[in-house]
């Protein structure tokens, strides 16, 4: 099967969020199963600066974008069994950031149009074009539109994956013809119209042959208003083609036995190195060097939907326990200020790093005993899987992928691999945090079992890739 994976970011080329991790791993896992896989993304400034010398020039052409004819270059790179293509246009992509510009609609409209037209330039016609989020949501629409008058596009199946439905690509109705070059019937007929605006993600959900969400629970949550940001009816009406596929993590990249950023390596069979990593983390962050005190950690964006209001409300309560608390992240000023003041109050028992450091993040995963993710919503979440891989027992709210990957510890039968709470309230969260701290102190054997279950769990992309392969086969029949 020939598969083209369309994304706006991918590790190791460029990253702003979890989409990049998925896009950097899933194509490789699909290729390992024997499929012919290629992936395509914009040639951003940071990609050209770092990878430019390794890129092979394929061709240049002009792309039709409404009334404009726009230059488009195509470059390629072979990596890990996947052919990576890069769409070049310096007007749109020679910028310091990936997103956040006034003309993002035009930028990714061009990208989607370029992908659609460049399908004819690929060595083999793809059977499936797999798109991600609003930035490539126009591709299924363009393919459906072109298939009416060009036989080449007939038979190409499309998939759209929703990583975070909050971001939908909404623009004024005048963009239909003037910016995206579509007949206004796409808007008037309701395919891309929502609330009087153009909604690109809605259009892809309606048009694509299959819709996937990044975890089974998130796929179900998207049918409800609390999670769907207005698109709950659209998701419910398209439920027959909606699938929840849990993301994986790169098990080789996230491996404490070979992670060079750690003070000491360790494995599920030999945890001596983790004790050294804990001591090293305490020294680096200025914490009291106490091996028997558990470290509770968060590596997160400091924004409300990550559950920070619950943490602020209960901090004094759970810090009344024998525990150390570490926070790595940046975000809203009110949370940054709160944690800065809290760090001063708790001295050597609390550390806060406002910003992001990949190396420090890995050192925190390795040094932590408990890992907190009290999110209001979490489509999938990768941090809880990385934490478990590094031997930090997770404490999570039961939502999205957190519910699918972390199962509550049951004292009466010893089942589970972490601690969970269902209701979004401070009391429930504080209760399970205290329960986890008490288990660490009072029942080392039970804690060690939870730790081992997390470290030995299979969070690889192999299973996820096979699920996607099954979806591709079902829509190509």
Annotate the PLM regions:
Residues 1-477:
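Catalytic cores of nucleotide-sugar-dependent glycosyltransferases that transfer UDP/GDP/TDP-activated
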């Amino acid at each position: 099967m020939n598969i083209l994976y369309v994304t706006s970011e991918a590790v190791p080329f460029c990253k702003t969020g979890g989409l990049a991790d998925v896009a950097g791993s899933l194509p490789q896992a699909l290729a390992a199963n024997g499929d012919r896989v290629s992936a395509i993304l914009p040639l951003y400034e940071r990609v050209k600066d770092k990878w430019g010398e390794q890129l092979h020039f394929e061709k240049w052409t002009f792309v039709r974008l409404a009334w404009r004819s726009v230059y488009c270059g195509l470059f390629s790179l072979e990596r890990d069994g996947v052919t990576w293509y890069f769409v070049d246009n310096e007007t749109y992509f020679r910028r310091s950031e990936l997103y956040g510009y006034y003309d993002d609609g035009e930028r990714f409209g061009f990208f989607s149009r370029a992908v659609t037209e460049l399908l004819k330039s690929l060595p083999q016609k793809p059977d499936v074009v797999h798109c991600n989020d609003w930035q490539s949501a126009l591709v299924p629409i363009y393919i459906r539109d072109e298939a009416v008058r060009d036989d080449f596009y007939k038979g190409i199946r499309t998939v759209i994956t929703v990583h975070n439905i909050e971001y939908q690509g909404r623009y004024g109705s005048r963009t239909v013809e003037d910016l995206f070059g579509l007949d206004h019937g796409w808007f008037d007929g309701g395919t891309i119209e929502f609330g009087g605006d153009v909604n690109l993600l809605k259009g892809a959900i309606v048009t694509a042959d299959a819709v996937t969400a990044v975890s089974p629970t998130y796929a179900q949550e998207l049918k409800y208003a609390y999670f769907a940001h207005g698109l709950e009816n659209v998701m419910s009406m398209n439920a027959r083609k909606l699938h929840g596929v849990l993301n994986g993590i790169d098990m080789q990249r996230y491996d404490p036995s070979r992670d060079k950023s750690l003070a000491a390596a360790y494995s599920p069979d030999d945890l001596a190195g983790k004790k050294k990593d804990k001591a090293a983390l305490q020294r680096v962050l200025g914490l009291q060097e106490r091996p028997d005190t558990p470290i509770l950690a968060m590596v997160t964006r400091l924004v409300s939907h990550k559950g920070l209001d619950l943490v602020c409300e209960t901090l004094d309560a759970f810090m009344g326990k024998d525990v150390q608390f570490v926070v790595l992240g940046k975000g809203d000023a009110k949370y940054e200020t709160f944690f800065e003041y809290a760090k001063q109050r708790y001295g050597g028992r609390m550390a806060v790093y406002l910003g992001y450091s990949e190396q420090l993040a890995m050192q925190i995963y390795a040094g932590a005993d408990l890992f907190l993710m009290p999110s209001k919503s979490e489509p999938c979440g990768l941090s809880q899987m990385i934490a478990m891989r590094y031997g930090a027992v997770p404490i999570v709210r039961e939502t999205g992928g957190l519910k699918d990957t972390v199962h509550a510890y049951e004292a009466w039968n010893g089942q589970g691999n972490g601690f969970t709470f269902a209701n979004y309230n401070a009391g429930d969260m504080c209760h399970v945090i205290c329960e986890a701290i008490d288990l660490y102190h009072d029942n080392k054997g039970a804690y060690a079992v939870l730790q081992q279950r997390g470290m030995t769990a299979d969070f690889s992309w192999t299973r996820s890739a096979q699920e996607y392969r099954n979806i591709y086969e079902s829509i190509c029949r």
